[in-house]
Amino acid sequence: NKFGKFDFPSVYLEVNLKNLKNLDLIRKRKFNHNDFDPEYVNASLKISDPKNPKEYKNIKVKLKPKGDREIHFMNLDSMSYKVDVRGKKNFVFGMEEMSIQKPIVRNYSWEILFHDLLKAEGIIGLDIVPIKFYRNGEYLGIFVIEESFSKELLEKQNRKEGPIITVNNNISHIFPNLNFKTYSERYWLSKKKDFFEKSNQNLENIKVNFEDKNFNLFDYFDTEKWARYFALIDLLKMYHGSSIKSVKLYYNPTTGLIEPIGYDGHFGSGYNDFAFIDLIHDPDFYCGWICTHDKNWLNLFFDPRNKDFIESYLLNLKRFTSKKYQKNIENHLNKKINNINNFFYSEYQGSDRVWFIGPLPYYFDENVIYERQKKLLKKIEFIENYFEKINQKNIAKKKQKILLINTFNSNEDIINQLANENIYLSKGYWILNNLKLIDKNIFLEEGSVVILQGENSFVGKNKVFKFSGPGMITQFNGEINLSNVKFSKIKNIKINGLNWSGAFNIINAKVIMNNVEIIDNSGEDAINIVGSKSNIDQLVVNNSFKDAVDIDFGELSFNKIICNTSGNDCLDTSGAFVSGGYLFGENIKDKLGSFGENSNIKIKEVSGKKVNFGVVSKDGSKSLIENLTLKNSKILAASYKKKHFFGNSNLKISKINSDENYQNAKDKILLSKPNSIIINNIEFKNFIKNKKILKKFYVGS
């Protein structure tokens, strides 16, 4: 492939002679003293990308040598860099923090495949971009840019900002005799101290109590994501990525649980006959250095008492070893990975021997994966018979407790009220399960927090079902069915360690709503729906303090949403798939429809009166509005970039009706390059600078 043409980007590093000499001195010192923490030097990058003709010139960066193996520091031309972009609105392929390294250091395309499959499974993975790398005009060969751990990583993958945690390798990386450290610790201590404290408290509790017979894995970890993570590691033999010193831990402030962030899987480090299955029937099964260093960490998950986790792990492993999943891998190899491999083959690349460069050239053999599937299938057959015997011991299934709440009321505390028309919930926490109520009035005392779990149904059959009073309601997992229900004067209440922004929150649940009204709420959102699958027939929000309806991730299908008087947006989406019939807003202080962060929007009719901004598609979102009707609107439509690590946005409006002639009113349509707006099948061409749009929308941006 030496003479093949490849459309991978070129990255040009410019560093002055003084700083280059400093880099080389630091590299040599790091080579001889691995515990040495090097300093940054200033430099700049320029990017030329055939897929994106716009050149990014002179992006200011700071960089230093990085790595924990000698292969990172062997010489100046092949050394690995840790790179941070200087400046708030500059990004390199959507990254603000990254590494630039030789492909062998990142396990060639095996690591890219690993992270792609993680992301396809809803697990946080890193972007890895192959590049042609130049330093001061000299071509140094093929390198890869790998994303680092930042809030941008989380937002791009539909997560709210939360602490990312790793192991302090300077002390120990053997669980539980280790110390954790948080990325950007100063930020968390100054901005969101409760998230920092709760995540660290949970990790310390795990270290102290993991051998206790009452220890509950489900209280601390998002076990479904961890089950998929370990099963995928089994498939690709990425066992290095299972080590506590490799995998990064994300504390999700929406769920209060820890999720994995894949890192450093490193295919090829042995383990042909091992799988995590072996630990289920034999906790002392020998599996080399992983079991030597991570025995307690792995047994934390693969203890047979963790019935739900093991069942989920086995189900995912069966899925990953199926013919259907093999076809998915083949398709991904053909679509992306094979081209990357051909790019790597275009220059001589020595095989990866972990600690050194092998004498043979690198070659990607996909048959290794398919042979691995066959081997795992045999192990699955054995363990299912073994696990069935274990299940006969009636090991109780465990449910997640919300660890942030120690004292609470339960169903037993309202059982005497259930026959009454009026139910009173006093100040404090109420964790209620599987309620099926009809024609009730539920009064929330000031400071009451109602957390619903399981399957809940509230129906106004002969009259309106009412929730009223200054308390907060949250459906946490499970399912909620609301029909003919009115929420009055509910409010958001802060719970330390959690990011629940609504007066009414729905998290990771199935939602059915018909004829629901929320009136006079207090808080950032009247209703915040996160990571859920929602079907709404009619939802009306009156007099919302800030956002009326906030959809973070997940799917929403609605017939009618109406907002009357909102202090901020009517419908605000982030990373959501939305299909709607009719959206109406009146007296909206900000945006009628705010669609951001890779949302995918299709709405038949959007209508508004006295709206500050009409519809906005930003930060990688794709939005289609069939009919837009606005009266007394400052801005009709806009497409721009608020968060520069997202891609381009587009907004298509099939038909627009307005008391303003948008074709002659350039200030009514706001568009920045390279985003797009199409109205009545005509592409809008009046571009203005993105920063000018931000000034109009966000004071002080």
Short names for language-model regions:
Residues 123-134, 216-220, 247, 324, ...:
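Surface-exposed patches in mature extracellular/periplasmic domains of secreted proteins
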